[in-house]
Amino acid sequence: MQNSLDLKPISHVNGTVCLPGSKSISNRVLLLSSIAKGTTCLTNLLNSHDTQHMLNALKKLGVRYNLSDDKKTCHVQGIGGPFHLSEAISLYLGNAGTAIRPLLSVLSLHKNNILLNGDDRMHERPIGDLVDALIQGGAVIEYKKNKGYPPICTKGGFLGGSIFLNGNISSQFLTSLLISTPLALKDTTIFIKGNLVSKPYIDITLNLIKIFGVNIEHDSYNVFYIKGKQQYKTPGKYTIEGDASSASYFLAAAAIKGGSIKVTGVGKKSIQGDIEFANILEKMGATIFWEDYSITCTRNKLNAIDLDMNHIPDAAMTVAILALFSKGTTIIRNIYNWRVKETDRLSAMTIELRKIGAIVEEGRDFLSISPPIFFQYSSIETYNDHRMAMCFSLISLSGVGVNILNPNCISKTFPSYFKDFLSISKI
């Protein structure tokens, strides 16, 4: 395993990047295909650690699938309803929040004895609000170490009914319930307490659920109404669009040191909220050209921005790097949920930005960033967080280069990232 990657100063970027499949969509449709009636052909599936954890779990749960040699096409034979297991099993899910959270709800629909486990960071990522919601619907769930955190064991028992869910920690909790509750024995009404974070990710979930034949109504994201005793049905074939969060690094590179870069796989017809990043780039001064399935960014003078980025927390990290190349002070607001991601991203970003000379103020839920007078060559700690590694690769566009520690952490979502990044770069 590579301990570090030294990126030399890059003078210019230009070209086209074909994006890997979206992580958020890949793991959602793998699960939906598994519990739907019929066989689903998934194309442009993301090949990464997180999707592999989901595939491994589904196999242990009895799902039959055929994965192509390049791991981008998967034929999934749906079981037509909840998982029924006659014996106790344990599922290891690494640090894949997009796997453990939706699986917990689906596995709580039927009498089971299933342990959901993960790596050390997973044991620090909160899941208590989701567990509380499931218990309200009749589920029996036990914490195996610390209350509110994995590992956890579900015994089943979820029936539906009226559920109150905190919405201010992670949208994945609501996604988990939205996927499972159509299969519950009773109708379910989900009342959201507080402000719902990352609403575009809920839109992804609702869109995909509809593609699999189920429609869910809601009242301005405050109350969700789900009919029980439904069945998901295969759409036959589904092509996973490119990962919009991953697109942000290449679009940002063009804004800083283009040339122009075209990313394919996302565009005007994308269902992912993170395509909003391109609009933010345009507000900062870059030139953006949209097509149905591609976005092109061309360099222009960049100016600071002050914006609430709660709706695009992953792509907002890339804005923190753009701030270093922009005139003025950039403020990224309402991003408390950075603290419960793969690492505490607010703290990690502050520490690493200061290393390279930026002036940073870290608040409870915001970052204020002013560009450095001079960029300093630094070794960047990635905290085993794929997005830290990819974000800070852009420092190589500053003229001083950068050393990325533990670069292999990108395997969580984008194993070929550095290869693709260097392919559009000129030293």
From Swiss-Prot:
Positions contributing to phosphoenolpyruvate binding: 23, 97, 125, 172, 345, 387, 412
Gene source species: Buchnera aphidicola subsp. Acyrthosiphon pisum (strain APS) (Acyrthosiphon pisum symbiotic bacterium)
The EC number(s) this enzyme carries: 2.5.1.19
Pfam families reported in the protein's UniProt record: EPSP_synthase (PF00275)
Protein known as: 3-phosphoshikimate 1-carboxyvinyltransferase
Residue positions binding 3-phosphoshikimate: 23-24, 28, 170-172, 198, 314, 337, 341
Enzyme class: transferase
Major subcellular location class: cytoplasm
Highest taxon above the source species: Bacteria
Family: Belongs to the EPSP synthase family.
Entry GO MF terms: 3-phosphoshikimate 1-carboxyvinyltransferase activity
